[in-house]
């Protein structure tokens, strides 16, 4: 995959693709009893790609090699990781599965510990599509023999510390991921996939609601604030998995770690995904600038995808007859942060902005009724729109 121009970004390959390529290379060396420098692999999209093999070793009973992951121009924590595969035949122990190709994890591969993931608790975090890719790649070489394939990433546990794996319930290393086999550069899909997975875990763990955050500062502030204050949420509905609770009733319940989901700038996707999973009243923790962008109706609040429309904010303030000092501050300010700080996080202004944000959110996801928690720039909660039962 060569760069075609100075502006075109280069795609890369998923961990699943690299693991399958390494497994095929090891299988070929084991069968042919000679070194193999590269392999060609057919991806789920139907295209083929060729991969260079490194660290090749083989004996009469096993072979191993690795592929260095190239994520292209995608800022991926797994870029440069070594995806190792060892193929053994006959397997040292009877295979636990009925498949001709059994796949296990080794060093640096995580295990699932929570429900709601693509693999069951206790299983190696090798997702279904990569698993199938490995089985098919090795099956091409050993069509009628049972073999054991072990996938490992030497520094996988260290790399995993920079991911959300632990929060999602994947411990001990990285996940082997991918659906198309290709990593699209600077794509939002990796982030939105993580949001979806986190919501699946939250639902499977029985969370009453979820708390989205736009950044780590607002998330930490919300976690601490909710832990100290406690919170009541209207989550009595059939879809949420709490059918024994009456709709419209407020319940006091602590929120577990799984309830906190980092959505970043992907507000519309997060709201729709939450609604699809029965979370109709999520909490959104953010700073004031993000609240303004949510109120303006942007699906994505990143600076590259949204403008800070202070003129609209001023029009809302005038229409709501907010104090003249607030209106004047908005008119003269250059940033939402300046407005928030200069007005002392004026309660009427924040209430107005949260109301507009609620209306905009319902445009993204019909039936959604998010609650808002706003943190100042020192990590302290200065506003919330939680129900009256929470006003201690």
From Swiss-Prot:
Signal peptide region: none
EC id: 2.1.1.195
A Pfam match: CbiD
Keywords in alphabetical order: Cobalamin biosynthesis, Methyltransferase, S-adenosyl-L-methionine, Transferase
GO molecular function annotations of the record: cobalt-precorrin-5B C1-methyltransferase activity
GO BP: anaerobic cobalamin biosynthetic process; methylation
Enzyme class, spelled out: transferase
Pathway(s) of this molecule: Cofactor biosynthesis; adenosylcobalamin biosynthesis; cob(II)yrinate a,c-diamide from sirohydrochlorin (anaerobic route): step 6/10
Keyword Transferase set for record: yes
Superkingdom of this protein's organism: Bacteria
Record field: catalytic activity: Co-precorrin-5B + S-adenosyl-L-methionine = Co-precorrin-6A + S-adenosyl-L-homocysteine
Family according to the record: Belongs to the CbiD family.
Protein name from the UniProt record: Cobalt-precorrin-5B C(1)-methyltransferase
